[in-house]
Amino acid sequence: MKVYLRNKEIKKILIRKNKSQNWLAHRLEISTGYMSQLMDGSRHPSPQLRERIMNNLPENKFDDLFQIQDEG
C-alpha cells in the first residue's frame, strides 16, 4: 500500500489559507525539494510526516489530504 498526497486538494487548501507550498514545507521541517517530490507523487509521506501534515492542516480529514493505492 502506498499513500500519496492529494496534490490538487492540498493546493486548493493552501490557496484558501493564502499560504504557499514553501510555507508548508517549512512548517513540516522538510526541504522544498522534498515537498515538490511529495506533491508530484514521486515520493510518499511516511506515517510520521502524514501526522505532521494533518497537524498543520487540522481542518481537513485524512481522505481530503491523502490517497491510498494498493500495490500490485
Segments from the language model and where they lie:
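Recognition helix of helix-turn-helix/homeodomain-like DNA-binding domains
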Residues: 30-44
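Short, charged recognition helix plus adjacent turn
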Residues: 32, 47, 63-72
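Short, basic-rich loop-to-helix N-cap that marks the start of a DNA-contacting helix
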Residues: 42-55
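DNA major-groove recognition helix of helix-turn-helix
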Residues: 14, 39, 49
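Helix-turn-helix DNA-binding elements, focusing on the entry/boundary residues of the two helices
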Residues: 21, 32, 50
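Short alpha-helical "recognition helix" segments of helix-turn-helix
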Residues: 24-25
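A short, Lys/Arg-rich alpha-helix, primarily the initiator
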Residues: 1-20
